[in-house]
Each structure stands twice: as structure tokens, then as C-alpha cells.
């Protein structure tokens, strides 16, 4: 399949570029082998900020009442999943815009203008690699002990 632009990765760099390209008349294919939205939305920034917000709310209640409320960890994790799912649905909605084809497959290069994904070949004069980053645990003593929770869990 021939297209104007191929983007590998659907994080903020990928989906914003796809939307901009499509608005400017380029037929764009965007590939993602994981969940739409990339690391920040699914395993990094957003889940972390959601859990931190939950902790801040617990601290605020404790400050106002003078006693620490009972915490339901499973509910906090469910809330984290709800927030990321809602934002991911928004990104998936953007990927349904006219001029954008979203393909949930791992993409690899055959040559400088050809991508192979899901057993199919895709060609474009321009290919953007927007694979972003991976979350990483900081070197903090005890971080690998039981009871430590990361945004990935």
C-alpha cells in the first residue's frame, strides 16, 4: 500500500504529527504495537500523576479531619485505569480522523521507504519514527521491595 506519510508510534509526537499531516492533505498511516497514546499516557506520566493526585486527596482529608482515611488501593488503581482508558479513547478517536489510518501492528523497515507490518508492505516517501521512550525505575534504595508500586502495575 502506498501512502504519503508513515509514522511509527502513536504517542504525543506520533498522533499530533498524524493529525497535522492529515489536516494538510497527507494520507497518513500510523503504526502502534501497543496501546494508542504511547508510554506517557499508558505507563508513565498520566498514570503516575493520577496516583499522585489520589495520594494528595488522601493527605488533604487527613489534614482537614485530623485522621487518615482508610485507603482502598484497588479503587485507586481502578481510577488510574479509568483515567488512562478515557484519554486513550480520545487518542484512538483522533486516529479515526479523515486521512489517517491507524494500524495496530509492530512495524519494521524493509528499506528506506518501505515498512512491513502484519505481513503487509507499506510505502511512503516520508517515514517518521516517533517511538518515544520507555519508563524506567530510578536508582532508589528499596525500590524493588514488596509493596512498592509503579505506574505500570
Regions from the PLM with identified roles:
Residues 1-13:
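Beta1/beta-strand and adjacent pyrophosphate-binding region of the FAD-binding site
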Residues 2, 19-26, 31-153:
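Glycine-rich flavin
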Residues 11-17, 21:
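N-terminal glycine-/charge-rich "phosphate-binding" loop or analogous flexible N-terminal tail
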